[in-house]
Amino acid sequence: MKNRQLIQAVDVHAAGEPGRVLIGSGLRVKGATMAEKLRYCEEHLDDFRNLILHEPRGYPGLCSPIVVPATDPSCDFGMIVMEQGGFKPMSGSNLICTVTALIETGSVDVSEPVTELRVDTAAGIVTVRAEVEAGRAKSVTFGNVPEIGRASCRERV
């Protein structure tokens, strides 16, 4: 039987939360911005999301970030998150999984003892700092995008 699509995935975890990072999905995710890429995934790739996350390949607790080209030239890569309930613009644990996988597979330029990256997400640009030793990510921290939920809620009251 011929393979119709080859997918490169790395299974990692962030504090025990599993992530299957797709570093070579072969997907052509269209969009001029990360928000457009997210919308494209929602409209065209839900069957693919189910293929990766549901049995027999996946399981209920699994999430899967997709590494895509960044739309902002200042960023090192882009990320879209597939969760059981759909596609999400950003997830901290999935970001940690993605950065760990990319560092440990040599998919991004690594500087020891600290690697700094900029990640393009549909929620905005996220800055990441990874402590690296012997090619392994020892810790990953990030400065997330601003929260808008509280301000929006206050304005409604």
Regions found by a protein language model. Give the residues of each.
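A glycine-rich beta-to-alpha transition motif near the start of alpha/beta enzyme domains, typified by
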Residues: 1-146
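Residue-level detector of conserved catalytic or cofactor/ligand-binding positions
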Residues: 147-157
